[in-house]
Amino acid sequence: MSCCGGSCGCGSGCKCGNGCGGCGMYPDMEKSATFSIVEGVAPVHNYGRVEEKAAGEGCKCGSNCTCDPCNC
């Protein structure tokens, strides 16, 4: 996820989210401070999937809060 200097956040479909005040793929969710602790759950083994997740985070904001390049 790209911070773009803290001024823009790309929303779903590589369209910039409303407000342009965030730093993330889904700006409407990034301000949430809620978290859950789950105990007693077995770890998930994701062998070979780390690269897939990292490759999909190529959204960067250009001028006027537009995504550039659009490859998210």
Curated annotation (Swiss-Prot):
InterPro entries: Metalthion_15p. GO terms for molecular function: metal ion binding. Keywords: Metal-binding, Metal-thiolate cluster. Metallothioneins have a high content of cysteine residues that bind various heavy metals. Belongs to the metallothionein superfamily. Type 15 family. This is Metallothionein-like protein type 2. It comes from Solanum lycopersicum (Tomato). The lineage of its organism: Eukaryota, Viridiplantae, Streptophyta, Embryophyta, Tracheophyta.
